[in-house]
Amino acid sequence: MVLIRVLANLVILQLSYAQKSSELVIGGDECNINEHRFLVALYDSTTRNFLCGGVLIHPEWVITAKHCNKKSMVLYLGKHKQSVKFDDEQERFPKEKHFIRCNKPRTRWGEDIMLIRLNKPVNNSEHIAPLSLPSNPPIVGSVCRVMGWGSINKYIDVLPDEPRCANINLYNYTVCRGVFPRIPKKSKILCAGDLQGRLDSCHCDSGGPLICSEEFHGIVYRGPNPCAQPDKPALYTNIFDHLHWILSIMAGNATCYP
C-alpha cells in the first residue's frame, strides 16, 4: 500500500512538472533584457488593453501586423516588464499608418503588414534601438528567434509581464500549405515553428518579429488554434518580399500597392 502511494505521488509530480513546462515554452523563456531593444508594445489608447507587438526599424518608423490596427493606438518603446517602467521608456502615437492596399478592405495572404510613422522620432538608448531590415531572403532550415508578450497558455490568454523568446525553425512553404490548405501556391509568407509542438508564437504575439541571422525577416501573422501543435507551424509575413514597398514609403515615394 505504501509503495502504491509513493508511485502515485511520483506520477502526480511528473504530470505537474510536465504541465508547467508546457505552459512555459509556448511563448518561450523570458527574453534577455538587452536583446529586444527594437521590440514595441502596442496598446489601445482608449482602453489601455495590450494589442500586439511591433518592431522599430528606424527612429521614426515601426512595423507591425495590419490586423493589429485600431483607431486609437499608443506605442511604448524601451519596455521589458509591463509593470515596470524604465527611465528611458518612450511613448509615441501614430502620425501616419500605411497598408499594402489601402483601398481594399480584405487583406490578401502575406500582406498583413502595417507601417507606422511615429508622431516624434525616438532616441537610441540603453533599451531602444532599431532592428536591421533583411539584406537577403531568409534561408529554409535556419533557426530563427520569435518574441513577444503573447499568451503563455495555448488554451486561454495568459499574458506574461515580460516578453518571451523562443528559437524556432524556418520550414519550406509547402509544410504550411499542408496545415493551411487555403493559402495559395505562392505568397509572401514564411513558415516557421517547432514540429514537435513545444515552441510557438501565440495569441497577442501578432505583429512581433521573426529574426533570422540577426535580421528582421518576418511578422507574426497567424497560426494553428490552439497554438503549439505538433506538425503545425505558424505563418509569418515575409519582410524581404515587401522591402521595396517599405523603403519607398519611408522615402515618401509610394503609398499603396495597386
From Swiss-Prot:
Its assembly, as annotated, is: Monomer.
Kindly list the places in or outside the cell where this protein is found, as annotated in its UniProt entry. Answer: Secreted
Query: Can you say what this protein is called?
Result: Thrombin-like enzyme ancrod-2
Query: Which part of the chain is the Peptidase S1 domain?
Result: 25-251
Supply the InterPro entries for this chain.
Answer: Peptidase_S1_PA, Peptidase_S1_PA_chymotrypsin, Peptidase_S1A, Trypsin_dom
EC number from the UniProt entry: 3.4.21.74
Reaction catalysed by this enzyme: Selective cleavage of Arg-|-Xaa bond in fibrinogen, to form fibrin, and release fibrinopeptide A. The specificity of further degradation of fibrinogen varies with species origin of the enzyme
The entry lists its GO molecular-function terms as:
serine-type endopeptidase activity; toxin activity
Mind telling me which SMART domains this protein's record contains? Tryp_SPc
Instruction: List the SUPFAM superfamilies hit by this protein, alphabetically.
Output: Trypsin-like serine proteases
Chief place of localization: secreted
- A single Pfam family it belongs to is Trypsin
Q: Which CDD domains match?
A: Tryp_SPc
Domain of life of the native organism: Eukaryota
Q: Where is the signal peptide?
A: 1-18
- The residues responsible for catalysis, as annotated, are H67, D112, S206
Family affiliation: Belongs to the peptidase S1 family. Snake venom subfamily.
User: Would you list which residues are glycosylated?
Assistant: N123, N172, N253
Positions of the pro-segment in this chain? 19-24
The UniProt entry's GO biological process terms, in alphabetical order, are:
proteolysis
Keywords attached to this Swiss-Prot or TrEMBL record, sorted alphabetically, are: Blood coagulation cascade activating toxin, Disulfide bond, Glycoprotein, Hemostasis impairing toxin, Hydrolase, Protease, Secreted, Serine protease, Signal, Toxin, Zymogen
Tissues in which the protein is found: Expressed by the venom gland.
Q: What is the native source organism of this protein?
A: Calloselasma rhodostoma
GO cellular component term, pick one: secretory granule
